Amino acid sequence: MMKTLLLVSFLTLVAPGRAFADITAFIGVNTTPTNRQTSGFAVGVGLLIVGFEFEYSGTREDVSAGSPSLKFGMGSVLLQTPVAIGGFQPYFETGAGFYSEALGARTDSGFAFGTGGGVKISLAGPLRLRVDYRGIRLGSGALASPAHRIYAGLNLKF
């Protein structure tokens, strides 16, 4: 009887009740090496406190400032609170993916690692504001690494 009670208690704590998904469209600033507009989207799914996300973003080059364009796609693992606390759901994430950087005729592409975090703020119903910081370490041939990005976006939870 005690083993059954312990097993049921354990399964109740670790088994996900329901998966949640969300999509974010964002705009922000890439601060490396100069401030330039960046934009993109992210699609994710969460299971209690662990989530998975795919993101794509792009930043245009500024030849006069010597700032390369940067495009990347990244898969990440998120650790987040299972529910919003006072309308705020903080998260931490880390991931890896591929990037492409270009400045004039010079191009570089390769593997990138990203780490960051942020908060999803409840607005109305399933609509949330997402604020995020990301540090992205690019390959050894990159002109500007690590890249730092700050953004805000509209997030729809479903």
Segments the model singles out, each with a brief description of its role:
Residues 5-14:
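Sec-dependent N-terminal signal peptides
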Residues 15-21:
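Sec/Tat signal peptide C-region and signal peptidase I cleavage site
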Residues 140-145:
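A short acidic/glycine-rich loop-to-helix N-cap element
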Residues 22-37:
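Short N-terminal segments immediately surrounding and downstream of signal-peptide cleavage
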Residues 44-113, 121-125, 129, 150-158:
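Gram-negative (and chloroplast) outer-membrane scaffold detector with strong preference
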Residues 36-41, 74:
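Short amphipathic alpha-helical segment that frequently serves as the phosphate-/nucleotide-binding helix
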